[in-house]
Structures are given as C-alpha cells and as structure tokens.
C-alpha cells in the first residue's frame, strides 16, 4: 500500500528558487504565472508561489465527463479538485482555505497587494478535446459575455503537441480570429496574456 506524501513547504521553495534562478541567469524577469500540473497543486504551493512573486496560477482543471476525454479520478483527487471546476469556470481569487472556486475570504495575497488569481484550464488540454469541443466551450463563454458576465477561456496547448495537433489548433485559432475581427459582434473577443486577464478581473472585482 502506498501513502501519498505532498512536497513540504521547504521543498517547494527550493524548487521555486531553482526555477527563478534559471530565469535570472538567462536575463529574464520574474515570471508572473505558475502552471502546476493540476494534480500537484496544493494550498501550500499556492502560498509559496505568491510569496515568490507569482500573481496567477493556471492549474484548475475540469475533472468531469461533460466534454472530451477524462483523466482517471486519482489524478484530480490527489490535489482535491472536484466538479465545482467545469468548462464554464471563470477566473477566481484563491482562498486561504481551499484551491476550489467555492473559496471565500480571506484570499491569498501576492507581492503587488492583490489576490492570487486562478485561471482555470476550462478548455481542458490539447489531446482531450476536438476542435468542435473547443469551439463549443468558447461559445459558452461568448454567451456569458453577452449577458454581461466577465469571462475568459484558457486554451491549454502543450508546446510538444503543437506540431502533432496543428490542424486542430489552427482550426480553433482561426475561429477565434473570426470572432475577434467581427466588428458587428455584441461582445468583444480578444486574445490576452494571463497577466492581462488577471488585471481586468481585479478591476472588475473592485
């Protein structure tokens, strides 16, 4: 029988320090977004990335079967994700008591004095969904926006999968291009970095 044992806070800090040192040695600044495998995420990790200068996380993942393929339950159960994370999830502030979107005050604070924000991988990841699945998820969020709800879609694409799934990704991105270029659309669809999405949501929450 195996016993699950998470990384300690000290171990997490050592790994983060190593990662940040690699960025610094190559002349880059401090990265702002941390994407942990959703199954390795924990409150300990979220607190430590906030301490080290990260302002956003991209780990929340829909465990359900509503759209596309599904990981085995053990993957999301390791971290504590549940069906409160769906393809309809939107960015949220991370609570000090849970990594789930159901969390409430107090929130984990970052070095800029604002909350650590989770950007859910609401479009699942590259191999799990078809182009039509991804377009359908995008359309859900467009409808949210038409009702006045702030939202964002995270297209999670692994660098190593870009060539293998090029046709699918190209189809989806062309679809997004068409939405963003439609001057008569009821809502504006635009590409944005995680930092830009976080800034807009913080402004919205205020």
Give names to the regions the model predicted.
Residues 20, 46-47, 173, 177:
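Short amphipathic alpha-helical segments and helix-helix/interface helices
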Residues 35-149:
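Active-site-adjacent pocket scaffolds in enzyme catalytic domains
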Residues 10-11, 44, 66, 77, ...:
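Glutamate identity and glutamate-enriched acidic tracts
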């Amino acid at each position: 029988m195996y016993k699950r044992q998470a990384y300690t806070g000290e171990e997490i800090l050592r790994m983060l320090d190593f990662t940040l040192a690699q960025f610094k040695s190559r002349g880059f600044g401090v990265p702002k977004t941390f994407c942990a495998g959703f199954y390795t995420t924990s409150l300990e990790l979220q607190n430590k990335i906030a301490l080290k200068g990260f302002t956003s996380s991209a780990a929340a993942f829909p465990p359900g079967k509503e759209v596309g393929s599904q990981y085995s339950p053990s993957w999301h159960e390791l971290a504590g994700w549940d069906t409160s994370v769906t393809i309809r999830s939107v960015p949220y502030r991370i609570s000090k008591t849970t990594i789930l979107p159901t969390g409430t005050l107090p929130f984990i604070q970052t070095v800029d004095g604002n909350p650590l924000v989770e950007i859910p991988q609401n479009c699942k990841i590259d191999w799990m969904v078809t182009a039509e699945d991804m377009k359908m998820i995008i359309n859900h969020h467009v409808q949210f926006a038409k009702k006045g709800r702030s939202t964002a879609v995270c297209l999670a694409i692994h660098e190593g999968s870009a060539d293998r799934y090029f046709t699918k990704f190209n189809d989806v991105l062309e679809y997004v291009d068409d939405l963003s270029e439609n001057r008569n659309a009821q809502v504006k669809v635009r590409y944005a970095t995680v930092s830009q999405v976080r800034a807009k949501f913080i402004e919205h929450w205020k």
